């Protein structure tokens, strides 16, 4: 399931969602700054949303409401794409191919199977590629612009890490859906009251059994409205603070809200909860090595043979590993320490070096090993299990703060871009 950090921002790169191919005769649906949204764009996304809803057996609102949601989505996309063009943001064919391959993999399909599925659904593959490229540009522009506005202080990381550490062994994750009833910038009291009344009415409908996904499609101003407001799984600490507080005692099936923020009133549905172990232990290795690099005066084969001779001298007692490293090793970072690499996790090393190291027993020396750096003799001195919970908690705290602030700042940023853009809707 997709992560809510991505879904909250509306990056809907799913294998069965794409715009239909443009029609020969087209009209302008909206003017956005110096660009346009075409009727074919609106009709194409309408087709995709209806197709997805049918496959998911999800009810949709009436066409007028759905069209309004789609128009707002396309207007926002156009605004951000124009920013990307000015910034020179480009997605290479290689990046695009990799993204599409990942989408196919996430949907348990080969690339050919996905192309066949798109064709079966009446969706043009080249048009699909273009839409994924657009979504990637939108994502990059949004991420770059929003992250520039975020500051995370060391004290914040320490405080949240301590909170995480004081929790139970299993930290809670939630699967949420979200509805946003928006407020304009500097709203009047009447506008606030009207939005709050609408939000409370939606909460009442949801608590009385109305389909939350249909309510989201009909009323939500969030970018994921067309996905039924689905945010997916994530930790409670990754949410904006006002959400986390409101969800601290929530149970599966709860409808939470309305919650007031700077951009409007939020309604959340807790689809599910689950726990996750926080104990983190890693194995570190203490190793040393002797490195010989092939050069114009030493061929690759000569370097290997030289290391074999050094290994034989160490085994016979003619020299020690440390002495040989100081005399022969061409690794400037470890030669003077007798080749000692200190304590580290094995995954930081070159793959060939790592694989050879993990096959050694304590006190054992390898045969010559070839890596991207040259030829090595490796000796495993010791291993240990290290509790990395504290470091992991700080790393997690930083990511949680980034995700939380990103969600809050992204909503404000998008509202600002929409308010400052010239938009004229020409059709209804």
UniProtKB/Swiss-Prot annotation:
Domain PpiC: 171-272, 282-382
One MF annotation (Gene Ontology) recorded for this entry: peptidyl-prolyl cis-trans isomerase activity
UniProt catalytic activity: [protein]-peptidylproline (omega=180) = [protein]-peptidylproline (omega=0)
Biological process (GO), any one: protein stabilization
Domain remark text: The PPIase activity resides only in the second parvulin domain. The N-terminal region and the C-terminal tail are necessary and sufficient for the chaperone activity of SurA. The PPIase activity is dispensable for SurA to function as a chaperone. The N-terminal region and the C-terminal tail are also required for porin recognition.
Name the record gives this protein: Chaperone SurA
Enzyme class: isomerase
Top-level division of the source organism's lineage: Bacteria
Chain segments annotated as transmembrane: none
Protein source organism: Shigella dysenteriae serotype 1 (strain Sd197)
Functional note: Chaperone involved in the correct folding and assembly of outer membrane proteins. Recognizes specific patterns of aromatic residues and the orientation of their side chains, which are found more frequently in integral outer membrane proteins. May act in both early periplasmic and late outer membrane-associated steps of protein maturation.
EC number: 5.2.1.8
